[in-house]
Amino acid sequence: MTGTKIDGKVISQSVKDRVKKAVEELKNQGINPCLATVLVGDNPASATYVRNKHRACEEVGITTKDHKLDASTTQAQLNEIIENLNNDNSVHGILVQLPLPEQLDEFTTTSRISPLKDVDGLTPHNAGLLAMKKAALVACTPSGVMEMFDYHGIELEGKNIVLINRSNLVGKPLYHLLLDKNATVITCHSRTKNLVELCQSADIIITAVGDRNKFTLTSDMIKEGAIVIDVAISRFQEKLVGDADYEDIIQKASFATPVPGGVGPMTVAMLLKNTITAASLSSQIGK
């Protein structure tokens, strides 16, 4: 029996609809939600991602400020721009597009962003709050995955979940979010020795390897009725693919996300939601 496709385009639109209403409410209070983006260099993929984020903001009524910097920008120069945005009361969210040129340090850069404007959820402050169940701004992809579970009414309590990623952007924040839902989470990575066996016993598999030459999730690696969330995206044999062979696993899984059209749209939608949250926080602090 074929499983159910978790359609990120449909779910992300439902998030955008809610955000659009929230934007209207904030504007009625005299607050104009604004996202500032910072792009360093001329990486074509990064430029495309930023354009997509600006387009999504326009759809829901969020104002954007675009800062394009030369690839030779120094750390001191980038720090100064971030500090200026931190002090700009008209800006509610700050997003520095990653990756950065090699002369710039990602940790130093993200640490400079005000936690109240950290719409990517990457500052050490917000990462710590997440571990303590107190974060208002959470990394967009992990929160997008959680939104997918909520949309389909998928219960996480007591579930055995294999999470194949340990990055600061996906694996670590998602681990905390799943743990908060009383799931049993096993984090796997490139040094995990019994990955296939762990996957075969999992109720839910969330995979974000991003290299089909190294890893492909197939139906023989999952149990009947498992749920598969594919966070990865890469180009393989001239196609955009995830980690999972979707057409194969959907014959065995109860739910699965396609690539493209799965988790990807959710990441942008949750960025919009975080921007609204940040704007709301700023209005509360200003009272």
Curated annotation (Swiss-Prot):
- UniProt xrefs under CDD domains: NAD_bind_m-THF_DH_Cyclohyd
Catalytic activity reads:
(6R)-5,10-methylene-5,6,7,8-tetrahydrofolate + NADP(+) = (6R)-5,10-methenyltetrahydrofolate + NADPH; (6R)-5,10-methenyltetrahydrofolate + H2O = (6R)-10-formyltetrahydrofolate + H(+)
The record's GO CC annotations read:
cytosol
Q: In the UniProt record, does the keyword Disulfide bond occur?
A: no
For this UniProt record, give its keywords in alphabetical order, as a comma-separated list: Amino-acid biosynthesis, Histidine biosynthesis, Hydrolase, Methionine biosynthesis, Multifunctional enzyme, NADP, One-carbon metabolism, Oxidoreductase, Purine biosynthesis
Q: Look up the EC number in the record and give it.
A: 1.5.1.5, 3.5.4.9
> Does this UniProt record's set of keywords contain Cytoplasm?
no
One GO MF term attached to the UniProt entry: methenyltetrahydrofolate cyclohydrolase activity
Domain of life assignment: Archaea
GO BP terms in the entry:
L-histidine biosynthetic process; methionine biosynthetic process; purine nucleotide biosynthetic process; tetrahydrofolate interconversion
Please report a single Pfam family linked to this protein: THF_DHG_CYH
Which positions bind NADP(+)?
A: N165, R166, S167, S190, I233
* Pathway(s) served: One-carbon metabolism; tetrahydrofolate interconversion
Role this protein plays = Catalyzes the oxidation of 5,10-methylenetetrahydrofolate to 5,10-methenyltetrahydrofolate and then the hydrolysis of 5,10-methenyltetrahydrofolate to 10-formyltetrahydrofolate.
Subunit structure of this chain's protein:
Homodimer.
UniProt similarity note: Belongs to the tetrahydrofolate dehydrogenase/cyclohydrolase family.
Query: Which PANTHER family does the entry link to?
Result: C-1-TETRAHYDROFOLATE SYNTHASE, CYTOPLASMIC, C-1-TETRAHYDROFOLATE SYNTHASE, CYTOPLASMIC-RELATED
Protein's recorded name: Bifunctional protein FolD
Recall the taxonomic lineage recorded for the source organism: Archaea, Nitrososphaerota, Nitrososphaeria, Nitrosopumilales, Nitrosopumilaceae
